[in-house]
Amino acid sequence: MQAITRRLVLGAALVASSFGVLAQNKVILGVAIPSADHGFTGGIVWWANEAKKELEKKYPDLKVIVKTAKDAGEQANQLQDLVTANKINALVIFPQESAALTKPVEQVHSKGVYVTVVDRGLTDDSGQDAYVAGDNTAFGRIPAEYIAKALGGKGDIVAMRGIATTLDNERMDAFTAVLKNYPDIHLLDAKYANWNRDDAFKTMQDYLTRFKHIDAVWAADDDMAVGVLKAIDQAKRTDIKLVFGGAGAKGMIKTLRDGTDPRIQANVSYSPKFIYDAIKMTAEARLKGEKLPPKSIVPSVLITKDNAKDFYFPDSPF
């Protein structure tokens, strides 16, 4: 991840503003992110505040204002406050929802604020200057390929979806595209569980009631995988041989590394640290009067027991 970050920051430094503007005297950078309502967003909040602390110490002409929101409505209101009360001239936003935040972000952008969107893309990208995200296509493709191979190309599976966002669509589209190559693998259902372990627990209970045989579960998130496993254990179902989460939460990676649950055989990387990278890249570019590349993607890779030690960070909040 450090090497990836260095490459992204170097790329940002090389992309000068097409308008040739001089460096700004003062950058007031607003950061709008979801509240820490599950493990991944907990990591997002932690890394955002780490960026604020480190960058404000390093750059006296930079002020970073971090706002967390419990839903799309609150986040939209915070954007108004950041513009009118805090007078921001740059924004890094991890949208609560894609569609609901597209217009509010466009309104901020129309006032001359430089906008970097992170992870959950907008439905219309004309209101942004840059986009930084993990590789959502690989995040969906890698689990599908692993599950298909593990099942020998045939079996019954169920899936979880997150929140209705562009990134969730990208992941699901990539997952189902792989399955088209395996006509004997049947995707029984794929419901939204909001990247939440309690919602995933309830969704999995529904699946277990409706489907008498399931070979594997694509939980699509490590928090949701925890809820899935709890539901399976409570139902005492032994038919499910594989539960594939995602994002590399330390608890799940430890289980994978130690081999303590045979259903946890693999994972896919997707670190919340990219919010730190996005804030750092945006702040440093704007202090120089420069722009970021229009799109920066952090690769996702397959994590197995063989390389799990490289993705296990015991001091991380996620």
Language-model-detected regions and their locations in the chain:
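N-terminal signal peptide c-region/cleavage motif recognized by signal peptidases
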Residues: 18-20
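A residue-level marker of the well-folded mature domains of exported/periplasmic proteins
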Residues: 3, 23-318
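N-terminal export leaders
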Residues: 6-10
